[in-house]
Amino acid sequence: LHSLRRRQRQMCIRDRYASTAKLMSQLKISKAKGTILADLKRIERVDLMILDDFCMQPLDAQSRGILMDIIEDRHQRRSTMITSQIPVKDWYDVIGEKTIADAVLDRIVHHSLRVELFGESIRKRKSKSENAYG
């Protein structure tokens, strides 16, 4: 992910990285403050939005609505990269509410290029090598 972001910057592609859970929390606060439309507009305009750790925890009603807004605003206009350790088949349950889950997943899954990575995580490998020399 870091190498990809570095390459995008070399190509002058504007990106924004966010942990999905943290982004939802920030946008809930901006909704309470009345600034969510401006924040969503900034997300909509970025060339590549990276949502990391997608579907790691169930979404509440407000987060579902915000996620739907983000995906709908960006759908077929701008690129969105989603990383997750949760299998795609389980995203439906994590998103919850059938109508929104259908709409979000239809836009994400059916118009995407999927790259599945297998094997040990880099963090785990780095930790082992640091402990071996530590």
Model-derived regions: residue spans:
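Single conserved hydrophobic/aromatic residue that forms the stacking wall/gate
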Residues: L1-I13
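Short basic/glycine-enriched coil/helix segment immediately N-terminal to the Walker B
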Residues: R5, A38-D47
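Short, well-ordered alpha-helix to beta-strand connector turns
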Residues: R9, V46-D47, R78, S112
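Short beta-strand-centered segment that lines the nucleotide-binding/catalytic pocket of NTP-utilizing
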Residues: R14-L23
